[in-house]
Amino acid sequence: TDMLGKKITVDTKTGGNNNIIVGTKASLNSEIQKAVSSDLDQINEEGYIIKSININNKKHIIISGKKEIGVLYGVYSFIRLIQTNKSIEKLNITDSPKTNIRILNHWDNLDGTVERGYAGSSLWNWQKLPDFIDQRYIDYARANASIGINGTVLTNVNANALILTPQYLEKVEALANVFRPYGIKVYLTARFSAPIEIGGLKTADPKDADVANWWKSKAKEIYARIPDFGGFLVKANSEGQPGPQNYGRDHVDGANMLADAVAPFGGVIMWRAFVYSEHDANDRAKQAYAEFQPYDGKFRENVIVQVKNGAIDFQPREPFHPLFGAMPKTPLMMEFQITQEYLGFSTHLVFLPKLYQEVLESDTYQKGKGATVAKVIDGSLHKNKITGIAGVANIGSDLNWTGHPFAQANWYGFGRLAWNPYS
């Protein structure tokens, strides 16, 4: 009503002319199903169609998908057409996301502070959860769904094990319940030393049977509360964070142990490749390559290695990370930074999607010319089952969400490129 200046009539029955008919494939009547069947065959489980049809001399616009989430994405796409003054005559749109995991990484701490955050404090008011559900949680979910984001990591990669305790999992469950209708899965960061800090064990060695069993038990506990829990994001053996190397193990040992814990429930481990130490003799730019490339193909099927766009640390003009052209047997996901750590915080006006686009269009030459970074992360180059793209969020408690009002465009642009890295 606000957008068009007139009230729209909503009905559960199809009749009359010039209808917008919205629903899953299964909910459409047989006549309409037949008219859009070939279009629906072209989309995946999250995809949608927007199609103008004429049945019995009556015009309709059909917005449909195989699943409810696809229908929701289709509705947002249709609204975007209207908002941008595009024609809605003779529509014939079929669209599906190119990546499986399109996710925001919140570097939010449990005390309400946000590492590299320039838009106020954390959105998550842990003190009031699970009983008080802030309207902003719902608005956050709607905004993300409108640009195709389907996952959120609630906590900082410099992790706090307390998030895995029952007291906090109850709060996480409340957020998951809010986000679920909008197709957004909740993920958490896993502190590698959690078995010691909250589990009473004397070690966090990934080869220790008690440690592996502790993580399996913890995963079972989480999935009992949140059946669609996405999995864990892990920062290990970097900038002082604990990890498998503390016990003479490697990244594969750590990632695979956690992967085995969440695998029975369909969970994913996103293991970060951002590793460096001031005590390591290696050139920092080479360290991730040195620690990960030799293990190409050794990770479990439900592990995806999350690689920053550059080898140093989100530097404004650094080349794309060499790992994108060096691990053909391992799913890799992109990690972009939406928050402006190196680009003026929330003081400067910067449009980041052009930077993202440049990285995605860069050629790895992994299989000859045209083997772009986008083709690596969307799985089309190496036929990966798990694909993804992450963005370190620039969102906080500020009334305009992002501190600088223009920074909303970076959140928006990330979501659109996560859906389609070629757009």
Predicted regions and their residues:
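Acidic, contiguous N-terminal accessory segments
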Residues: 1-58, 88-92
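Residues that flank catalytic or metal-binding motifs in active/ligand-binding sites
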Residues: 16, 46, 100, 301, ...
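An acidic- and aromatic-residue-enriched active-site/binding cleft used to recognize and process polar
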Residues: 25, 66-68, 109, 156-159, ...
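Short helix/loop capping segments that flank catalytic or ligand/cofactor-binding pockets
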Residues: 30-31, 71-74, 113-115, 313-316, ...
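Feature activates predominantly on carbohydrate-active enzymes
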Residues: 37-233, 263, 351-353
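Substrate-binding groove of N-acetylhexosamine-processing glycoside hydrolases
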Residues: 90, 224, 242, 249-423
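Hydrophobic faces of well-ordered beta-strands that scaffold small-molecule active sites
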Residues: 102-106, 152-154, 186-190, 232-234, ...
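Active-site-proximal beta-alpha loop/turn segments in soluble metabolic enzymes
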Residues: 196-205, 235-246, 274-284
